[in-house]
Regions:
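Hydrophobic packing residues in well-ordered alpha-helices of helical domains and bundles
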Residues: 5-9
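Short, small-residue-biased leader/transition segments that mark boundaries at the very start
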Residues: 1-3, 114
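Rossmann-like NAD(P) dinucleotide-binding subdomain of oxidoreductase/dehydrogenase enzymes
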Residues: 12-15, 23-114
Length: 115
């Protein structure tokens, strides 16, 4: 695993964690009538699937995982068969950090047909 990939991955996780703290709702004025206020709410959309390539195995995974977790979504990552250890270590690090079971999963192959 390349140390630059690991350091970049840590920076990405930090950035999404900060962005996640700003996902509160807000009131905005209506375009047609300034007396009307509209509320913007940001809610999780549900489980997210991510398919990652072999190059930069940490960086490619954290870009997807960081965004999904910051938005409050659970995620299933289909890791690359060519570099299986990096995504597995990353998922384990999230588990060790206290991420609840079932929030982040990792698979490598789904039979012969990818679904």
């Amino acid at each position: 695993m390349c140390s630059s990939d690991l350091l970049a991955g840590a920076d990405i996780i930090d950035w999404f964690a900060e962005e996640g703290s700003r996902t509160y709702g807000r009131l905005v004025a209506s375009r047609g009538n300034l007396a009307i206020r509209q509320m913007v709410l940001k809610d999780p959309v549900g489980p997210v699937a991510a398919f990652t390539p072999w190059n930069f195995p940490i960086n490619q995974v954290v870009r997807k995982v960081g965004a999904a977790l910051a938005a409050g979504c659970s995620m299933l990552v289909k890791g690359p068969e060519e570099t299986p250890a990096s995504p597995a270590a990353l998922v384990q690090a999230f588990a060790d950090a206290g991420l609840p079971e079932g929030v982040l999963g990792l698979v490598y192959e789904i039979g012969r047909a990818h679904v």
